[in-house]
Amino acid sequence: MGSTSSTPKSTICTFSTTAPVTSSTPYFFNPKKEHIILAFFAGVLLTLLIVALIFLIVKSCRKCHSSAQTQDPPSEPPTKLSSLSKESLTYASMTFKPPEENSNDLTRNHSSGLEPTIYSQIKVTDSDLPLP
């Protein structure tokens, strides 16, 4: 009876608590409503900026070309250039008359007082003419 020790056995209890692991995606992969709206307006503003730049470039190119044309002296005298511009607006006149054998009284009464004339502008393909 005396061979056992009177000290109690110590028991070590270990409890492991693990934090709940959530599989979260990075912040930039989870867009919010505000971020989508901001991206939309940024895209619209960027598009307007690009269109404005293209417009200004085209406008400045037109100014460069028009100022280059006014600085170059014309190779021909101005009187000849003005006569060419008047000649470029040439009109043709044509009168259509129906054949007499196929016309009836209705068309004969209406077409007797009228003389239809067709005007057509003739385009000149000479590139030496100044543009208005």
UniProtKB/Swiss-Prot annotation:
Any one Gene Ontology cellular component term annotated for this protein: membrane
Membrane topology listed for this record: Single-pass membrane protein
SS bonds (residue pairs): none
Keyword Glycosyltransferase included in the entry's annotation: no
tRNA-binding among keywords: no
Ranges where the record places region Disordered: 95-132
Biased composition (Polar residues): 104-124
Name of the protein in its database record: Transmembrane protein C1orf162 homolog
Superkingdom classification of source: Eukaryota
Localization per Swiss-Prot or TrEMBL: Membrane
Keywords: Membrane, Phosphoprotein, Transmembrane, Transmembrane helix
Transmembrane segments: 36-56
In-chain residues carrying the UniProt-annotated modification Phosphoserine: S111
Signal peptide: none
